[in-house]
Amino acid sequence: MRSNGCGDLREQNIDQQVQLCGWVDRRRDHGGVIFIDLRDRSGTVQIKVDPDLGAEAFAVAEHLRSETVLQVAGKVRARPGESLNDKLATGAVEVLASGIIVLNNVKGNLPFPVSVHDEENTREELRLRHRYLDLRRKRMNDNLRLRAQTIQAARRFLEDEGFIEVETPVLTRSTPEGARDYVLPSRVCGGEWFALPQSPQLFKQLLMVGGIERYYQVARCFRDEDLRADRQPEFTQLDIEMSFMDQEEILQLNESLICSIWKAVKGIDLPRPFPRMTWHDAMERYGTDRPDTRYGMELTNVSDIVKDMGFKVFSGAVKSGGAVKCIAVPGGNDALSNVRIKPGGDVFSEAQKAGAGGLAFIRVRNGCEIDSIGAIKDNLSDEQKQELLSRTGAEPGTLLLFGAGDTATVNKALDRVRQYLAKELGMVKADQDNDQWNFLWVVDFPMFEFNSEENRYEALHHPFCAPNAEDLSSDASQWADTLPGARAQAYDLVLNGLELGGGSLRIHDSALQRQVLQTVGLPLEEAQEQFGFLMDALDVGAPPHGGLAFGVDRMVMLLAGEESIRDTIAFPKTQQARCLMTNAPGGVADKQLEELHVASTWVDPSGEDD
């Protein structure tokens, strides 16, 4: 039906007869001559319809609407000098139409314009409801092609490194791995349920036991959790596992993988090696295990300086086992007024959103004099002032913002404020479209964190991470005592403040695996019922193994310069886990429920029947 793509025509095609197919992007009537911008996935080209050269084509062109599907025959010619368009790849040429065939018309009004000239003005709800139309837009088309290029680049690298792609089951059993499972009732096995996999974690470990040695998969995963801009109920991860490799070898190989992807997709040579930081240092210096290292404003712990001062908010926090930390905002004196920092202000509100009661502040003036409001200034000795200035490195014009309270809340609040101010003050661009790629390995995570509400330990990553041998007693009878404080041989790759992927070395000893499951509160009988197959596999000569999984949706979001993974997925869900286009999820017939041996207990809170 066509000889060329619309966006492929160049000066070397001049005088060629071509056939093009595509959609009408725009139509312009210039007093007897009609111009059509014809668009397909390759781009857009200008069609000139002159009644003297094609009366029938002109008659068709007079009544065309945007998004009408056309086949156009004509001759490529150079555009006259005054009509050259350097914003288009095809801007040096146009096609003189000799024939136009309408392949399909648009019936009724379009829900929104598709043309690149109008695409930024459409509400996301409309875009998702009519996703098939939204996908015609250049931005979405480019994103999906970039996604395909990313996956292809990963496959090429991994296959060159001896990995093989293996599919793992989508229907499996529910296990306590972390997030809530999506579960499906079994019709054949009444009263029993499948679960959709949150990750292929156990299956890829079993593949290592099976001697596969190097596995990868572009895996679909499912988690029934609260959503946000970079989460979906169903998502894709590049899943990798390998045997007979230590942590250093795994990190190096995955650095090479990332570098090959960035080179193939962006044409960028990333600097290596990627920096590394321990989890403890990340939390102390940035308040998060996903630090954005493109800018400064690191957190400074000043608890020891203010622990005895008369300002009870500070001294009380330290005495109760918490912390006082601050961030130094360069140029903050001029950029941030008191109104913005005090209650009701935007900066104050960011701290509150993270659970903090608020912020305290000090302004560093010329001559390194400090200025504050009320009790802070009045209760700081000259020695404490100098210690604060020395430790924070604050210069004149710097604003010091303080958080005080339990350490976790202080970290969370100052991390949020830090990220907010970096965008507000232009330290990073407000969107992800930038040329800064600050990769960072975060290593030495704790194995566990204590859940005070449930009075038990929880695995920080998952209960299959191997502990650091330095932190584990060689006497197995001591494991119950030494495991809670152990570091995991786990690692996350962070890019510009977002977790790009994470993994660990795995436990390959069944006795240690049982002890870890007991540490997270799983009784031996339940552990055997849930994970007996894994324990049996570890007992038949499981090799040392480890791996990593990258979030494909998030990786493509960063590569594409988007703010939401929804713009990198063909048919995403909303933050309410709904597909607005198909109206999923939806109800099912009573007969289907009967066949599945399931009854619904749902009561509509509105009081209306479904």
Swiss-Prot record:
Residues under site feature: Important for tRNA non-discrimination: H30
Ranges where the record places region Aspartate: 201-204
Location within or outside the cell: Cytoplasm
Keyword Protein biosynthesis: yes
Gene Ontology CC entries for this record: cytoplasm
Residues noted as binding L-aspartate in the record, renumbered to the chain: E177, R223, H461, R506
Keywords assigned: Aminoacyl-tRNA synthetase, ATP-binding, Cytoplasm, Ligase, Nucleotide-binding, Protein biosynthesis
GO biological process per UniProt: aspartyl-tRNA aminoacylation
Keyword NAD: no
Reactions catalysed, as given in the entry: tRNA(Asx) + L-aspartate + ATP = L-aspartyl-tRNA(Asx) + AMP + diphosphate
Subunit and interaction comment: Homodimer.
Family assignment from sequence similarity: Belongs to the class-II aminoacyl-tRNA synthetase family. Type 1 subfamily.
Name used for this protein in its record: Aspartate--tRNA(Asp/Asn) ligase
